[in-house]
Amino acid sequence: MCIRDRAIALGHDLGHTPFGHAGERALNNVCPCGFKHNEQSVRVVEVLEKQGEGLNLTWEVIDGIRNHKSAGMPATLEGQIVRLSDKIAYVNHDIDDAVRAGIMNEEELPKELRKVLGNSKRERLNTLTHDVIVNSMDKPKICMSEEVREALMELRAYMFTHVYENPLAKGEEDKAIRMVEDLYSYYETHMEKLSLIHISEPTRLALIS
């Protein structure tokens, strides 16, 4: 694997919150300037790591981390690989989680989607990965075929309707949001309670600024 691919993949979610996207939405609600985990990931590697000195990463890696989840497209092929890999990975992980939680069965996925993508996680990952490789060969960008891209988008839409908005999942998400918002409110007025005693002064200032 290319070193840049690996660096972007390892760094792209360093700024994520507890409870994933639910925690991200909670912080975005309460932070005066909003909160996006991809921007926080950049802050981690540029400011917070190495006692406030950052990791001295290349601009290509920083760009890939920042744009793996935003309106902008990564400037490099490596960044585009990670961005697309992230989409492929999390929708399949979410299916696994939903099955384990008893929210759905894989057999309930629409037949037309299973026909294109496959009937199991292994088949879906194989289809999606192979499609990206074949359709990106000798091209200046990383992409999928129209058929598979649309099937992936429809799968994500199905997950939003039947899983993410499911009353059970929604109830757990609401609890997570309240927890993060309550913690933020508490520490905002009790900064002395933050465990910063073993953190260097540059890092401490970066954390509270």
Locations of regions flagged by a protein language model:
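Residue-level recognition of specific faces of alpha-helices
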Residues: A7-L10, G64, K87, L207
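An N-terminal structural lobe/cap that precedes and organizes the functional/catalytic core
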Residues: R4-Q51
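Single conserved hydrophobic/aromatic residue that forms the stacking wall/gate
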Residues: M1-I3, I197-S209
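Short, function-defining helix-loop hinge/capping sites that tune catalysis or transport
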Residues: G20-H21, D94, G102, S209
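Histidine-centered, transition-metal-coordinating active-site segments
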Residues: F35-L196, S200
